[in-house]
Amino acid sequence: MSDLTVSFLQTALHWHDAAANRAAIGQQLASLKQPTDLIVLPEMFTTGFSMEAPGQAETMSGPTVAWLREQAAAHNAVVTGSAIIEENGSYFNRLLWVRPDGSLRYYDKRHLFTLAGEQHTYTPGQARLVEDWRGWRICPLVCYDLRFPVWSRNQPAAPYDLLLYVANWPAVRRTAWMTLLRARAIENVACALGVNRIGQDALGHDYSGDSALLDAKGSYLVEAHAEAGLFTHTLKRDELDDFRARFTALNDGDAFELRA
């Protein structure tokens, strides 16, 4: 089994300007100085967290999906983040998971943020996504999903190794973001990555970043704090396997069945 090099981008976003965001993010990704396996972008990285889906949504054949395919091929890495997608007359806050060969899978955000009225605009997802990538099993989720531990619960029969969240999580609730991200790593005996944005959106919401990568013990491997930038770290396969072999909490949990 191999190690996994993970890169994530913490950045401000241009409000409702997908072309500007793709261009700015593309420039930042071009600064990668080492090979990486996985590149993670924030939630709604083309628009900011918006309820104006009719004017901002793209289709799966639109420019953002094409751009993700270009970036994945250029960096020989999976590139992921969420965007506003229209499909069959419905709108989704859709995490797009794009491999270097152009193949694509996706996860639609399950828990919609009722405080912002997200449920009135978007359709919730019905299933989790767990992807096998270069020897690691990865479960990508979106923002508000972080507050619901049953949805991220690891399965001892086929555990994921890395749990990741892409987010537009406001600074006013940053304590919850940091606390829950750490809890998700510890309770699932898995590495955890949370990728948030910084700056202020057009609605006046401030974002403090606090993107972080943690190991399965809940120890910080990378903390971005409020800094803009592209962060890279290599997760060690043997460290995760050794810890799980010694600390078998996944096998001691209660049996359950998850239904969407």
Task: Name what the model sees in each region.
Residues E86-A158, V172-T179, R244-A249, R259:
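Active-site catalytic loop in hydrolytic enzyme cores
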Residues G81-A83, R94-W97, L129, S211-L213, ...:
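Short beta-strand scaffold segments in enzyme catalytic cores
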Residues P63-V78, R147-L230:
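CN hydrolase (nitrilase-like) catalytic-core segments centered on the catalytic cysteine
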Residues A20-L29, R147-R153:
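Short, acidic/polar
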Residues T232-A260:
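Short, basic/aromatic-enriched C-terminal tail that caps enzymatic domains
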Residues A19, G26-R105, P170-A183, A190:
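Cys-nucleophile CN-hydrolase/nitrilase-fold catalytic domain and related Cys-dependent amidase chemistry
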Residues D3-L13, D17, R94, R137-D145, ...:
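Active-site-proximal beta-strand elements of phosphoester/diester hydrolases
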Residues A12, F45, I84-I85, L112, ...:
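Catalytic metal-binding/acid-base residues of hydrolase active sites
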